[in-house]
Amino acid sequence: MKTEILQADDANIEKCAEYLRRGDIVAFPTETVYGLGASALDPKAAEKIFRAKGRPATNPLIIHVADKAQIETVAVVDDRSRKLIDALMPGPLTLVMPKKEVVPSIVTAGFDTV
C-alpha cells in the first residue's frame, strides 16, 4: 500500500474520493482526531479498516456523512432523530439509529444500528 500526504485542495479531495470509490482507505482529520475511512457500503473496504487498525470485528465502525440527505441512505431516521439533525447540523453530531439493509453487517459488527 502506497502512502501519500496530500493538501486539502479540490483536486486532492477528488483524488481521495476516487480512492474510496475503488475500495481503498484514506486518513483524514475530524474535529478531534485523525480517522481512517473507507466506503461504508463496501464490505471489503471495511475489512481493510479493521485490519489497518487492529480493530476487533465486534467493535462497529462509525459512518461519517456529508450532509443531512446522506443520513437517509444508511439509517432509518425517526421524528426524534430528525429534530436533532435539523437543529444541530451542519456541525459535529453523533447519533445511533437503525441501519438500512444497504449497510454491510461487517460495518455494524452485526448490530442492527449504525
Residue ranges and their predicted role:
Residues M1-V114:
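Active-site-adjacent structural elements in enzyme catalytic cores
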